Amino acid sequence: MKTPHSLIPEQKENIKHGEVYFPIQKYITNLTKEAPVITMHWHEEAELTLITKGSCVYQIDLIEYEASTGDILFIPPLLLHSIILKSSQDFCSETYVFHMNLLGGNTADICSTRYLTPMVNHELSLPCLITADHPAYDSLCKSFAQLASLYDTRMFGYELAIKSYLLQTLFLLLQYSSTRFST
């Protein structure tokens, strides 16, 4: 089991992400020479990010990951993380911050007890950086594109589909987790 580093209350991001009954929020992050850093912080939600322009260094639980255009990042809940601009070129990313309760993390079913709760408790370690050479990359890109389209268009029932694409994303990442349970 991976033990995350100690969380300092002062580093907690105190922002409400989404609505009470639909706790997900989209963010576009832009880093420039004038504003090259997102400072170290943590929150109770997970993050799913696509780098849309440039390159950066993500620090997740004090481990550095170099990320560039097209890369996908997954940050589990309750992990310290920051972003630093890697070069003088501008950087942009699209991020969905979501609470695991959106996916059923607060229910007592097999998905919650076997997968979601262990993710939150860091008993399952999923890959944080997914690059083009990762076996799940193409599938994750398709899921991300569908998630983004649904979030923006908000057609009737979009909440159901967003939930399903987030669950699909976690399923794909679970295939490459460092701890697996037998079924």
Please identify what each model-predicted range represents.
Residues 61-62, 71, 85-87, 108, ...:
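Short, solvent-exposed loop/turn segments at secondary-structure boundaries
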Residues 1-68, 72, 79, 113-114, ...:
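Generic protein-terminus/edge-of-domain signal
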Residues 36-42, 84-86, 106-108, 160:
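Short histidine-centered beta-strand/loop micro-motifs
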Residues 53, 77, 98-100:
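Residues immediately flanking
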Residues 131-182:
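An amphipathic alpha-helical interaction segment
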Residues 2-25, 84-148:
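A hydrophobic/aromatic-rich effector-binding and dimerization subdomain
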